[in-house]
Amino acid sequence: MAVSAPAATVTIARCPMCGSDRFRTAFAEPPYSVHRCERCGLGWVSPRLGEEGLAGIYQDDSYWRSGSPKTLGYSDYRSDQRLYLDTFRRRLDFVLRRGPPGGRALDVGCAAGFCMAVLRERGFEAYGVEISETIGSHARDHFGFDTVHFGPLSTVTHPDGFFDLITMWDVVEHVVDPRELLRKARRLLAPGGLLVLETQDIDSPFARALGPRWHHYKHAEHILHFTPATVRTLLREAGLEPRQLTHRYGGKYVSTAFIAERAARLHPALSAALRPLTQLGSARVYLNFMDEMIVLARAE
């Protein structure tokens, strides 16, 4: 790695996962380029912010109420509470058919506490970890959780084997060192405990069809792009055995306004055609482009 100007920007000249210097540039949207490793298939963004710069993005409330959610952040994360709660209910119904019936659960990157709230509904003692107090305070102030740790997972002080279930929704694509993140999660899991990891699939048919217009190419924040093979390798290197990988439950409930906003990335005319949907008020739709994967892995 070489640091280029400005000083907070890092140029990534080797695969962050396998270390190979053999890669191709999938496409460029200056100042960013998306590279693909020719050895393992991982995708990554270069240049990217350093760790402090990345952390700073999520501390600013403009990330959680973004004027340009197509490229960074969310239009209004807190106001979509009902959509997130129902999304997590649907996902956890799938997970808990295969996971522990209760116990202690940790949501990594818990944001406003929506998944924690559903875990509590399902009978778990819910904990969270969140680097942004800006959004994490919602879990405390709105849901009454006093079990949110503010900081990276590496600073959590719970004893090894403390948790029966750990969830990571839309986390690994944001972090500089996902290998260390997962190793820490492995230490925190009880023997036989379950890790649930969800991230985008750069090799999904939808991602391939859209190319640079794929809505998960948000270069300032999504700095890594995984495939099923790279996720499985990463988990095994951390001491976790992947048991199931599915795209079926990676969808989410969204507002009609969200659909119109995302359509703008595909074509302005499509966005204009769908704009009347925004007049439907609180109407919602369950969307699944089969481009997000959920992996269940055991601590063995």
Please annotate each region the language model reported.
Residues 170, 174:
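A short His-aromatic
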Residues 203-205, 249-252:
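Feature marks short, surface-exposed loop/turn motifs that line or immediately flank catalytic pockets
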Residues 197-224, 229-235, 258-261:
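Short, glycine-/aromatic-enriched active-site segment of Class I SAM-dependent methyltransferases
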Residues 176-180, 207:
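Short N-terminal helix/helix-N-cap motif within the alpha/beta-hydrolase-1
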Residues 179-194:
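A short glycine-rich, Lys/Arg-flanked "PGG" loop and its adjoining helix->strand segment in the class I
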Residues 211-214, 251-300:
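Membrane-proximal basic amphipathic "stem/tether" segments
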Residues 1-169, 179-183, 244-248, 259-263, ...:
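Conserved N-terminal segment of class I S-adenosyl-L-methionine
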